[in-house]
């Protein structure tokens, strides 16, 4: 039985990754910051998978303590954990420092433990932020010198740090770059950017639709791609874009929700000038600004070819995510 060490197991994507690993017969060791999170995480994952081979270890991404011992005996590592804030922070280092330092810490521990392959969760925000409308692929990188916001900058710098740390060692590394992630949440807590956004859409807390369109993906597909990347031949040393080739607009998301009976989902579009004005005093509006009006498309053929991706229809993801949140 092969053991997989998983960071971010208490989060939206991490719980689905744990469930997929368990369904495929792996032993899973989940990294948690506090033992108080273990029971609710175990309960969430047990809804969709057997948890007989699930255990937890207490470690902190901001501390060196315990990491090398925690990974002992692990064949693979999934580094899914990453800090997020829907609102733009006053100090970008709140996001960037833990993302970069945590990633370096995980890779160093994995190399010390003799891990065969590490799969890192990055983002399309590490590919297209600061770029104009166009088509982008796995060789493209976000422009960290542009005003791209703290989240995109943290994902870009953390992934660059990961490649640098892994370069030249014996451990293989593969990166998954998801777009905006939708689909059912397993846990009771509304964490994760898209979960928070969906909750606001269906409860009327986003009264107007921003002019945003993004590559999107189902969370269960993201989990399957992470697990496939563990053993796929031809995956080592590569980045895989996990999202629709063409951007899906927030107007489309809202329309699917309204048609599914979520009457509070917005129907009016927010004028860009209004968002620019609001960004002066609203951190959420400020966080959206770098992506307003830009519509990137993606070269994602390698994800189909190497990882055998079979995408879930996004309308299904939107409806099932809303249903899981509104229970």
Language-model regions, residue ranges each:
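N-terminal Rossmann NAD(P)H-binding glycine-rich loop of SDR-like oxidoreductase domains
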Residues: 4-26
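NAD(P)H-binding glycine-rich loop region in Rossmannoid oxidoreductase-like domains
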Residues: 36-40, 46-101
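Conserved Rossmann-fold NAD(P)-dependent oxidoreductase catalytic core, especially the SDR/UDP-sugar
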Residues: 79, 83, 89-149
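A conserved pocket-lining segment of Rossmann-fold NAD(P)-dependent short-chain dehydrogenase/reductase
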Residues: 88, 144-147, 181, 188, ...
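Mid/C-terminal beta-alpha module of Rossmann-like enzyme folds, strongest
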Residues: 213, 225-286, 305, 314-327
């Amino acid at each position: 039985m092969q053991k997989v060490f998983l960071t971010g197991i208490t989060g939206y994507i991490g719980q689905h990754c744990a469930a997929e690993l368990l369904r495929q017969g792996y032993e899973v060791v989940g990294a948690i910051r506090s033992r108080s999170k273990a029971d609710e995480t175990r309960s969430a994952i047990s809804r969709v998978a057997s948890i007989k081979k699930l255990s937890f270890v207490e470690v902190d991404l901001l501390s060196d303590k315990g990491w090398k011992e925690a990974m002992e005996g692990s064949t693979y590592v999934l580094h899914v954990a990453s800090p997020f804030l829907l609102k733009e922070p006053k100090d970008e280092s709140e996001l960037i420092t833990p993302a970069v330092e945590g990633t370096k810490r995980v890779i160093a521990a994995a190399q010390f433990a003799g891990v065969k392959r590490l799969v890192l969760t990055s983002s399309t925000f590490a590919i297209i932020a600061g770029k104009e409308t166009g088509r982008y692929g796995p060789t493209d990188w976000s422009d960290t010198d542009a005003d791209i916001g703290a989240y995109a900058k943290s994902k870009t710098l953390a992934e660059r740090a990961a490649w640098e740390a892994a370069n030249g060692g014996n451990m293989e590394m593969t990166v998954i770059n998801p777009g905006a992630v939708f689909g059912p949440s397993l846990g009771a807590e509304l964490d994760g950017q898209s979960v928070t956004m969906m909750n606001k859409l269906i409860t009327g807390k986003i009264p107007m639709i921003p002019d945003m369109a993004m590559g999107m993906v189902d969370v269960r597909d993201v989990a399957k791609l992470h697990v496939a990347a563990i053993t796929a031949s031809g995956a080592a040393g590569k980045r895989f874009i996990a999202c629709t080739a063409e951007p899906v607009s927030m107007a489309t998301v809202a329309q699917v929700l309204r048609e599914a009976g979520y009457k509070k989902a917005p129907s009016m579009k927010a004028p860009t000038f209004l968002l620019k004005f609001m960004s002066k005093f609203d951190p959420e509006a400020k966080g959206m600004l770098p992506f307003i009006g830009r519509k990137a498309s993606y070269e994602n053929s390698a994800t189909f070819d190497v990882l055998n991706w079979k995408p879930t229809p996004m309308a299904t993801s939107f409806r099932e995510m809303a249903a899981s949140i509104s229970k």
